[in-house]
Amino acid sequence: NPCSCSQSHCCSRYLCMGAMSLFLPCLLCYPPAKGCLKLCRGCYDRVNRPGCRCKNSNTVYCKLESCPSRGQGKPS
């Protein structure tokens, strides 16, 4: 039992756990921190980076007005 005070070397165990808590933070803090980061990035992008954020931004789309209809551009 690492948190027991009755066993020997309890001070060294507590110092070790304290040092580990600095480098390995509580895993319960990870999802809220990740959500906060996503929210902050979204707000920053909305303010400073206007425009489309489509996943398929390399795909070329044709507007209906500029595309020839099926019967019109074909040679007869």
From Swiss-Prot:
The keyword Metal-binding does not apply. It is found in: Cytoplasm; Membrane. Keywords: Cytoplasm, Developmental protein, Membrane. Transmembrane segments: none annotated. GO terms for cellular component: cytoplasm; membrane. The keyword Membrane applies. This is Protein sprouty homolog 1. It comes from Gallus gallus (Chicken). The gene is SPRY1.
